[in-house]
Amino acid sequence: FFFFGWIDNADSGYININGDKLEDMSEKKLTQYRRKHLGYVFQMYNLIGNLNVKENIEVGAYLSDNALDIDDLLHTLGLYEHRYKLPNQLSGGQQQRVSIGRAIVKNPDILLCDEPTGALDYNTSKEILKLIEEVNKKYGNTIIMVTHNEAIKNMADHVIKLRDGAVRHNDINTNKVSAEDLEW
């Protein structure tokens, strides 16, 4: 996860995204790359407690020259009616939706999701996975998701399994299912 954002360095090999080798970039170029091309969704929502839903999402918009329309995104996220609520007035699933909104509002090429359902119950997890699927279809972002939930791999186009930091399996999923049809 941290390699794609070039937050951590690899022991060997390199990462090439859109023809750019990340390890050859200066710190300034890496910062620009992260701002323009990457959106992050974490297991812990990391929302700003004294900002409402809309303001938390706007924080991500300031990083982009090509930000999405916030009101349209709030509708997509199912949060428009909650846009003036503070994070402590939201459920865990709603907070994760805000986190996804903050990541996607800047219209990144790649959305990095680190255990986005890890702290959620089954039903809320399915809702979040459906939302990620919808965001992918609507905005065309590449989604890279890290998860320990084996069932989630079934909704992916491409599945890479790691063990101790090394790639163990690298497969194309030819039997992709929708988030709605996932079971665990």
What are these regions (language model features)?
Residues 107:
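Conserved catalytic motifs of ABC-family nucleotide-binding domains
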Residues 32, 86-96:
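Conserved ABC ATPase signature
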Residues 22-39, 177-181:
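ABC ATPase NBD coupling module
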Residues 51-58:
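Short coil-to-helix segment of the ABC ATPase nucleotide-binding domain corresponding to the Q-loop/switch region
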Residues 111-114:
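Catalytic Walker B motif of ABC-type/P-loop ATPase nucleotide-binding domains
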Residues 13-21:
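Conserved ABC transporter NBD signature motif
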Residues 100:
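Hydrophobic anchor residue at the start of the ABC signature
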